[in-house]
């Protein structure tokens, strides 16, 4: 038979173990659902994870949009200046999607180096560009040094 103190210690130990297990599962689920942002230069250099979804952002390269006939499949390239990553997307593109436009795509990179997008988001305000995209474009020479017109007002 256990003394009251031993019973309390057993309950405390079980509660600590239960809370620890719940925290572990919550953090594991949270980690698997995170979508990190990468620039085309980071993807080209191999920094982006293969086999895991992430976000890529940049400008749609002019004359790179190719639509497959009788299909919703679209191929285009997204660039941050010196590097461009081919993107394949099947679905309806946003109304604001066009060449030279800033976009963010969600998906994963395949073995051939093509980004398989599951979602494409176009910027809504013509004067706004996500800070990560603007910094990458500025750093890589794809954006003028004074890019204040791209910042959210």
Curated annotation (Swiss-Prot):
It is a single-pass type II membrane protein. Residues 134-153 are annotated as: Disordered. Residues 1-8 are cytoplasmic. SUPFAM superfamilies: Heme chaperone CcmE. GO terms for cellular component: plasma membrane. GO terms for biological process: cytochrome complex assembly. Keywords: Cell inner membrane, Cell membrane, Cytochrome c-type biogenesis, Heme, Iron, Membrane, Metal-binding, Signal-anchor, Transmembrane, Transmembrane helix. It is found in: Cell inner membrane. InterPro entries: CcmE, CcmE-like_sf, NA-bd_OB-fold. Heme binds at residues 124, 128. Residues 30-153 are periplasmic. GO terms for molecular function: heme binding; metal ion binding. Belongs to the CcmE/CycJ family. Heme chaperone required for the biogenesis of c-type cytochromes. Transiently binds heme delivered by CcmC and transfers the heme to apo-cytochromes in a process facilitated by CcmF and CcmH. This is Cytochrome c-type biogenesis protein CcmE. It comes from Methylococcus capsulatus (strain ATCC 33009 / NCIMB 11132 / Bath).
